[in-house]
Each structure stands twice: as structure tokens, then as C-alpha cells.
């Protein structure tokens, strides 16, 4: 996790130093926790990760959408949390559609979560949520202008990743901004990458 934290901080600072007028930086699903065994993911580590993301938003002076895990009393949630530069949490979404073995170890979320930046209403989705058109439709019906998607999508479903990005955007008339993990993830699993913006 420490190495992941160093990489995240370096990337966030690079964006902050080289890009002007950035309103939101997105990081992929469970960005810091790759390689963590879930039974070992305790409240102390969960809180440490939460505090880290808060500090990153403050350091870069912009909003950060962080894919993270959170340990609560009833179990572990797969979250996408938006941290403001002043330390506030603007949005906190728990993944609704858990994928395969996630169902054995994680608790599903139950609610749509939207937040607003500069008059733009943004809905949050995580990875497998993207495969369900009803969820993005519900966001659109509730006035969402943009979907922010944090993911850890893997091969061989790379074509499906592209299709979901294009479909969710065009079928709802919304922008879709998605970020995906890239490269080998262990046990022969390779993540697609291919982060994109569709309109």
C-alpha cells in the first residue's frame, strides 16, 4: 500500500503542477488496496486510507474521486469517495453491483450518489455497475449530466469496456468519464486500462 500511496501522490502532484483549471481527478477502483487480503483489511487500515485521500485532495488543491475500500461494522464496502480540497467529503458511493467473488467478501451499496461541481451534476459508478443500463438511466432521469466511473476492468472483456462507455453515454445523453486500472494484476489477470471520455 505504501508504494501505491507514493505513486498516487506523484501522479496527483504532476496533474496539479502541469494542468490549469482541473476540477476533478479520478483514480481507479480500490486504487491503493491491490494485493491486500480482505480478512486483513481492518478498521485501522481503512481509516489510514481515508486520511491519505483527504490529504491528497488538500495537497493538490482540487477535488479527488478515489476508488477505495472501507471497513464498517457490518463488513467491507467497495467505495468511490469524492474528497474536496478543504477536507469535506462531497460524495460517498458504495458499489451496488458486486462482481463474481466480490459477493462473498463485500457488502453491496443500495443508493445512487450524485454530487455537483460548477453546476454539473455528476453520478458515480464503479466497474460492474457500468454493465447495468438501468443504473445509468436512473442517474440521467434524476438530472445527472455526467457519469464518473472508477474501475478495475479486466481482459478479455476489453471490447465490452469500450461498448459500455459509449452506450451509457449515448443512451442517456450524458458525458461519461471513466478511469480503469491498467496492466498485470496477479493470477494471470490483466487490467484493460483504456480510460476515456465519451459524449
List each language-model region with its residue ranges.
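Active-site/binding-pocket entry motifs
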Residues: 31-32, 99, 183
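Structural motif
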Residues: 23-24, 122, 146
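Detector for methionine-enriched segments
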Residues: 5, 11-13, 114, 125, ...
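CN hydrolase (nitrilase-like) catalytic-core segments centered on the catalytic cysteine
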Residues: 48-65, 131-199
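Cys-nucleophile CN-hydrolase/nitrilase-fold catalytic domain and related Cys-dependent amidase chemistry
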Residues: 5-86, 92, 154-174
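Acidic/histidine-rich helix-loop elements
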Residues: 1-3
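Active-site catalytic loop in hydrolytic enzyme cores
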Residues: 71-142, 150-163, 167, 172
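Active-site flanking residues adjacent to catalytic metal/cofactor-binding acidic residues
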Residues: 28, 128, 179
Amino acid at each position: 500500500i505504501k508504494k501505491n500511496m507514493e505513486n498516487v501522490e506523484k501522479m496527483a502532484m504532476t496533474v496539479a503542477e502541469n494542468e490549469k483549471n482541473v476540477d476533478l481527478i479520478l483514480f481507479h477502483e480500490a486504487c491503493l488496496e491491490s494485493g491486500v487480503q480482505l480478512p486483513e483489511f481492518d478498521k485501522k487500515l481503512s481509516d489510514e486510507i481515508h486520511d491519505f485521500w483527504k490529504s491528497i485532495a488538500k495537497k493538490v488543491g482540487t477535488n479527488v474521486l478515489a476508488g477505495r475500500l472501507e471497513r464498517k461494522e457490518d463488513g467491507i464496502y467497495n467505495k468511490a469517495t469524492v474528497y474536496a480540497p478543504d477536507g469535506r467529503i462531497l460524495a460517498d458511493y458504495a458499489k451496488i453491483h458486486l462482481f463474481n467473488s466480490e459477493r462473498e467478501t463485500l457488502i453491496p451499496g443500495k443508493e445512487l450518489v450524485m454530487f455537483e461541481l460548477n453546476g454539473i451534476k455528476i453520478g458515480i459508478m464503479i466497474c460492474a455497475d457500468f454493465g447495468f443500463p438501468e443504473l445509468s438511466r436512473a442517474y440521467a432521469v434524476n438530472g445527472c449530466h455526467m457519469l464518473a466511473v472508477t474501475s478495475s476492468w479486466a481482459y478479455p472483456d476489453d471490447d465490452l469496456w469500450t461498448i459500455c462507455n459509449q452506450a451509457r453515454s449515448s443512451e442517456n445523453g450524458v458525458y461519461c468519464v471513466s478511469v480503469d486500472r491498467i496492466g498485470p494484476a496477479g493470477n494471470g489477470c490483466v487490467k484493460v486500462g483504456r480510460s476515456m471520455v465519451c459524449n
